[in-house]
Amino acid sequence: MGSEMCIRDSMIAKRGVKIDAVYFHAPPYTSERAKQKVVDLARLVAKYSGPIRLHVVNFTDIQLYIYDQCPHDELTIIMRRYMMRIAEHFAKKDRCLGLITGESIGQVASQTLQSLASTNEVCTLPVYRPVIGFDKEEIVRISRKIDTFETSIQPFEDCCTIFVAKHPVTKPNLKVIRRSEQKLSEKIDELMETALNTTEIIEIQ
């Protein structure tokens, strides 16, 4: 969770939308300090949004399995597709009406229009992106305004960056991505089930 996520949540909250959040934790690659940073940011956002239910998903085994089975230039896209599947599971379970993400177009390889379309494909709920047109300067300015900037820049690990390829695909071909996911077989379903069943829920006031 960084500046984009805090801005995303505060923008949606000011329209009266209740927020449930999902954080993907990958111990031992991401530390307890990284998790605490997310909790601290959620508390800051809760000042604007009201109570937040934070789902902490242990994503390590899923990430490692994808890393072992899939082409490395596709890792980020495939991991994010599984993150979206998990987020949608909790959204439907809690009767939410959509998913909200913090991407802005083109800032990183996973946020090109082609990449966003690839992650959207696995969801049946609508995906909203409140900061999609913001540049980095706008994001920093707003995060300072809502008092989340200093916490968001704490240099702790992020599960989206620990298995990044040197040259990640920026224009994923959906047929190729689907074919790579087929290699994951039933094992990925078992890992997903375990991750869902062991998710920690933290009520943020």
Stretches found by the model and what they are:
Residues 2-7:
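Short, small-residue-biased leader/transition segments that mark boundaries at the very start
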Residues 8-26, 30-37:
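Phosphate-binding active sites in nucleotide-utilizing proteins
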Residues 22-24, 57-60, 101-102, 130, ...:
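Generic beta-strand/beta-sheet core signal
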Residues 41-68, 158:
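A conserved beta-strand->alpha-helix junction
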Residues 63, 69-141, 145-146, 191-203:
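Active-site adenylate/phosphate-handling loop in enzymes that bind or generate adenylated species
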Residues 147-155:
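A short alpha-helix-loop-beta-strand transition element characteristic
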Residues 154-205:
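The feature marks non-catalytic terminal segments
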